[in-house]
């Protein structure tokens, strides 16, 4: 029996260009913020309401390099990963926490800048084994193939 499930699936737009850095042993790390939006109609006023959530996403190794090369602010992506909370101390010695998503799979859902949509997976943070699956016509959504994805682009500010 499973001890628990820690899985996150998100579709959203990047809020900024990816920031790619390298660890001392040469592993790539990319950090992005991803906006996801929910819309609903207010029962009392009938007005359409929207709430945008911002998520911190971390990519590692080859997946981080792909993110740095192909994604830009506003890029629409699908990610799968797991939640992780980190703890550190600030300058005053106060404990601080942040929760982020460690991505192990990413699909580009648009082809801004002339690039191809693609599916990429990274199932290792330590660099021991990376998995990258090249896009195929049966796996890759096209720019006009958003029929299964709700259209949240209308009110996102980028």
UniProtKB/Swiss-Prot annotation:
Q: Where is this motif: Important for interaction with partner proteins?
A: 153-158
Per UniProt, residues of the SSB domain are 5-110
PROSITE patterns from the UniProt entry: SSB
Q: For the region Disordered, give the residue spans.
A: 109-158
**Record GO terms (molecular function):** enzyme activator activity; single-stranded DNA binding
Annotated keywords: DNA damage, DNA recombination, DNA repair, DNA replication, DNA-binding
Q: What is this protein called?
A: Single-stranded DNA-binding protein
Q: Which organism is it from?
A: Coxiella burnetii (strain RSA 493 / Nine Mile phase I)
């Amino acid at each position: 029996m499973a001890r628990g499930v820690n899985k996150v699936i998100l579709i959203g737009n990047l809020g900024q260009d990816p920031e790619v850095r390298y660890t001392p042993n040469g592993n790539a790390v990319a950090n992005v913020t991803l906006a996801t939006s929910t819309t609903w109609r207010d029962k009392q006023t009938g007005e359409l309401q929207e709430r945008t959530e911002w998520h911190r996403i971390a990519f590692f190794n080859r997946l981080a390099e792909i993110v740095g090369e192909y994604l830009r602010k506003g890029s629409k992506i699908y990610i799968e990963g797991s939640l992780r909370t980190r703890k550190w101390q600030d300058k005053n010695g106060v404990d601080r926490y942040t929760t982020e998503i460690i991505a192990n799979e990413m699909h580009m859902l648009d082809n801004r800048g002339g690039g191809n949509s693609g599916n990429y997976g990274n199932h290792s943070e330590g660099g021991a084994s990376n998995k990258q699956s090249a896009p195929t016509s049966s796996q890759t959504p096209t720019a006009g193939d958003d029929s299964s994805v709700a259209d949240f682009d209308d009110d996102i500010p980028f």
